[in-house]
């Protein structure tokens, strides 16, 4: 075999893994496969619970106003038929109390159970960029560790920010890419975001199966966004 033929074979073998990875990424990436929704797909809040089908739902509570919005949204969703995994950030004892109160007041005891995970916070308010990089790495490690310890991966990941939700969402997406889970990622943008998405929303938008906004102009601007009115 001459030199040119050997070189061509080596180049093909070198590029083949990248080609396969690219095809796989296109196959699983919702931003490529999901149709644009836009503001014309308004079907009402009742359409949201239709996605919550599966044996386990993981709910991320982002602390402060994010937790408050999520709990008000969940007031319209019946979670009795699902195992529930509540995820909070380190130092956020208030969110833990709120989800436990939700469990006590709204959910009936039975065969479905609830678990609680505490992840290292990706970034604190006022933290420098350099410090936040290390915090994000610690958050990634913490997230991988806790997900590895789960008896099963969630069927649904429901989140609405802020920063700590990004490592969680991307690790779940990586597991989907590797074929280890089929988790559907649903992100609900904060009511405070009227004209622009949050940084967390922009980062998570490409990998979400559903991206829900609460202002119509956002659904017009971002074609994969779904609009059902104000949810809280």
Curated annotation (Swiss-Prot):
Residues 32-232 are cytoplasmic. Its main location: endoplasmic reticulum. GO terms for cellular component: nuclear membrane; UDP-N-acetylglucosamine transferase complex. GO terms for biological process: dolichol-linked oligosaccharide biosynthetic process. The chain crosses the membrane at residues 11-31. It is a single-pass membrane protein. The keyword Membrane applies. One of its GO terms (molecular function) is N-acetylglucosaminyldiphosphodolichol N-acetylglucosaminyltransferase activity. InterPro entries: Oligosacch_biosynth_Alg14 (IPR013969). It is found in: Endoplasmic reticulum membrane; Nucleus membrane. Residues 1-10 are lumenal. The keyword Isomerase does not apply. Keywords: Endoplasmic reticulum, Membrane, Nucleus, Transmembrane, Transmembrane helix. Involved in protein N-glycosylation. Essential for the second step of the dolichol-linked oligosaccharide pathway. Anchors the catalytic subunit ALG13 to the ER. Heterodimer with ALG13 to form a functional enzyme. Belongs to the ALG14 family. PANTHER family: GLYCOSYL TRANSFERASE-RELATED, UDP-N-ACETYLGLUCOSAMINE TRANSFERASE SUBUNIT ALG14 HOMOLOG. This is UDP-N-acetylglucosamine transferase subunit ALG14. It comes from Debaryomyces hansenii (strain ATCC 36239 / CBS 767 / BCRC 21394 / JCM 1990 / NBRC 0083 / IGC 2968) (Yeast).
